[in-house]
Amino acid sequence: MCLRIGGLNVDEFRKLLMKTGLVLVVLGHVSFIAAAVLHGTMLRFVATTRDAVVLQYCVVDILSVTSAIVVILAGISAVILSRYLPSTPLRWTVFSLSVACALLSLTCALGLLASIAVTFATKGRALLAPCTFENTELPTLAPDCPFDPTRIYSSSLCLWAISLIFCLAESMSAVRCAQLVHRLLELRPWWGKSCHHTIQASPEPLDGHDLLSCTS
């Protein structure tokens, strides 16, 4: 008889789950800030224009914000679960949020990649829609332009690249979190051991108590 979860004892499993949750919280906040900065520096000016490319930019930004919020919620839930492992409803909540995070973050990454590709293909013309220039190939400062047109192209690509990296990191962390909770739920086909719970019914923290009893 052993007191282990996926090769880890209960304390190690709790620490690993808490670290994974904290990573998700940090990544979610950074992604949210990046999406907010992108909206404040670029999208709020071009969102009023009727253009398919601009619409795609806005949809991806909204998706980024939504994904960041879900990631933060999943991270907080994982941290709470690390203290209340016996709670079955909380396990399912964290597992569902983690799967949703992985899918949303991956979708967001694909959308950001598409935005970068479209911007390169169009040379950022959609970003300059609110401004009027005699020569769009050589944009200069104009009194009727609400932003610096000489920097909008590079700034947008930089923010999209940063968001893309964090979305990929969120997706991998969410998958890791889902795998950890998957072990607690004993779901097939990845559960390799026959385990029997000795978890107390109350969701209170059980420091120093055995949570799982496994037999190979």
UniProtKB/Swiss-Prot annotation:
Gene Ontology CC, one term: membrane
Transmembrane segments: 22-42, 62-82, 94-114, 155-175
Alphabetized UniProt keyword annotations: Membrane, Transmembrane, Transmembrane helix
Annotated InterPro entries: Beta-casein-like
Topological relation to the membrane, as annotated: Multi-pass membrane protein
Compartment(s) where it occurs, according to its Swiss-Prot or TrEMBL record: Membrane
Keyword Protease: no
UniProt signal peptide: none
Family: Belongs to the TMEM54 family.
PANTHER family xref list: KERATINOCYTE-ASSOCIATED PROTEIN 3, TRANSMEMBRANE PROTEIN 54
Protein name per UniProt: Transmembrane protein 54
Species: Rattus norvegicus (Rat)
Gene label: Tmem54
